[in-house]
Amino acid sequence: MLQPKRTKFRKMHKGRNRGLASGTDINFGTFGLQAIDRGRLTARQIESARRAITRCIKRQGKMWIRIFPDKPITQKPLEVRMGKGKGNVEYWVALVQPGKILYELEGVTEEESRAAFKLAAAKLPIKTTFVNKMVM
């Protein structure tokens, strides 16, 4: 699963997921899966969607993952009293804003990529849409 090799600090503030997305254009492939909602995608969800796409396109074409889980989420163990510091890092998430391109595909037909992205979208907790590159 995806997670940073090393970070400057082990734990991070919760923060807020506001603002506009960067990475709203298709830069590498021909077709893309674009987020409509804002939310948090865990490393497990990103990997699950990646597996769904690769199994659907059967090793033809090329895929790019445009998001990376770089925010640690901490949790305290069950039945632990309040206080005594921040909990341990349990998993990593990527913060996603509307318009962000999540995955890109190239070298497959539009029908195949639509089918692959439909399977991947079922694994994700946010609404997504299919986009293709505008050739000008």
From Swiss-Prot:
Q: Which family does it belong to?
A: Belongs to the universal ribosomal protein uL16 family.
Q: What is the lineage of its organism?
A: Bacteria, Pseudomonadati, Pseudomonadota, Gammaproteobacteria, Enterobacterales
What does this chain do?
Binds 23S rRNA and is also seen to make contacts with the A and possibly P site tRNAs.
Please name the PANTHER family in this protein's record.
Answer: 50S/60S RIBOSOMAL PROTEIN L16, LARGE RIBOSOMAL SUBUNIT PROTEIN UL16M
What this protein is called in its record is Large ribosomal subunit protein uL16
| Record InterPro entries | Ribosomal_uL16, Ribosomal_uL16_bact-type, Ribosomal_uL16_CS, Ribosomal_uL16_dom, Ribosomal_uL16_sf
User: What pairs make up the disulfide bonds?
Assistant: none
Q: Which organism is it from?
A: Buchnera aphidicola subsp. Acyrthosiphon pisum (strain APS)
Quote the subunit structure annotation: Part of the 50S ribosomal subunit.
- Look up the record and give one Gene Ontology term from the biological process aspect: translation
> Keyword Ribosomal protein on this protein?
yes
The record's listing under HAMAP family reads: Ribosomal_uL16
Tell whether Transmembrane is among the UniProt keywords. no
GO CC annotations, alphabetized: cytosolic large ribosomal subunit
Quote any Pfam family the record assigns.
Ribosomal_L16
GO MF entry, a single one: structural constituent of ribosome
Give the record's keywords alphabetically: Ribonucleoprotein, Ribosomal protein, RNA-binding, rRNA-binding, tRNA-binding
